[in-house]
Amino acid sequence: MRAVHFGAGNIGRGFIGETLAANGFGIDFVDVNDTIISALNQRGEYDIELAVPGQKKIHVENVDGINNGEHPEKVVEAIKTTDLVTTAIGPKILKFIAPLIADGIKARKDADNKQTLDVIACENMIGGSQHLKEEVYSHLDDDVKAFADEYIGFPNAAVDRIVPLQKHDDPLLVSVEEFKEWVVDESQMKNPSLKLETVHYAPDLEPYIERKLFSVNTGHATVAYTGKALGYETIGEAIKDEKVLTQLKNTLKEIRSLLLAKWDFQEKELEEYHDKIIGRFENPYISDEIARVGRTPIRKLGYDERFIRPIRELKARGLSYTTLMETVGKIYHFDEPKDDESQKLQKMLKDEDLKDVIVETTGLKDDADLVAEIAASVKAAD
């Protein structure tokens, strides 16, 4: 069996690639990073290092690379016969690979390949695969859309594994935490007979996606923004500070109240899940930089993102969101010279009225009360 995977970066190699290889797949990695693609083609294998005592290694083989910038036709050829397509490239890049996937689907139709195929976007976003489907369908004619409706699935997925910023002499070596979770919405699959070991298949993915995004992503960002405000440079340093740890624990408590109100989770189950997350952030073998975890603050302030969405939903239910709101105030002070969004946000705050900036970044144009609360939080964080 073969898989075409878009994104040969650390998550692609260190999580999705590892899982696919462990399930017996050969992998065609697709990327524009020529250093990585060339190394994959020269060696056909790479190592993953687990961030645990002894730094256990996992060996991955039967892999190659395709530079989609130079050889888009090879990507189309690979999709024509592949058994699975996955992505780990970042939500904003999905639209750029959509034409290639569309051409691959057309090639399958032209070759009369009626083997069902699932395309799984493994991204930090809600509804990633369905978003990719919309982008792909915008490049399809009606007859190919009809073919895709019958044979091509776009099941949403939730993925979770911390892969810190890292540098190695070997461009293919990647260090990852031991914990990993990959959940796929089986109700959206076209090829449900192809199930991967260590991947969890659920009839409804939304509870798992929200649990992950509002716990891991919100929690990680909370440590970053609180730590930055206190002058720390790494997550590991920051979380040793009792103020940061308390902020994280109180945030997760607010998130628990929302998840319990919305979904069929058990309180003890969520408490254990959140304790595990705190332990992951405290892992001394993963040194993640606050600059990386906190980057793109404008995106992270989005209406459906990791802070504003849970705040909106907690407010609608009359539940507390005090700690989440405190962190939101700190995000507006995240001044990271190397991050373009951070610098754009600081310029907006200098040039525009604070409440206008809040509406622009959060999309809260219909909730003046919440905008006022955020403005107060921003001022309190001065």
UniProtKB/Swiss-Prot annotation:
SUPFAM superfamilies: 6-phosphogluconate dehydrogenase C-terminal domain-like (SSF48179), NAD(P)-binding Rossmann-fold domains (SSF51735). InterPro entries: 6-PGluconate_DH-like_C_sf, 6PGD_dom2, Mannitol_1_phos_5_DH, Mannitol_DH, Mannitol_DH_C, Mannitol_DH_CS, Mannitol_DH_N, NAD(P)-bd_dom_sf. NAD(+) binds at residues 3-14. Its EC number is 1.1.1.17. GO terms for molecular function: mannitol-1-phosphate 5-dehydrogenase activity. The gene is mtlD. GO terms for cellular component: cytosol. Keywords: NAD, Oxidoreductase. It is an enzyme of class 1 (oxidoreductase). Signal peptide: none annotated. It catalyses: D-mannitol 1-phosphate + NAD(+) = beta-D-fructose 6-phosphate + NADH + H(+). Transmembrane segments: none annotated. This is Mannitol-1-phosphate 5-dehydrogenase. One of its GO terms (biological process) is mannitol catabolic process. Belongs to the mannitol dehydrogenase family.
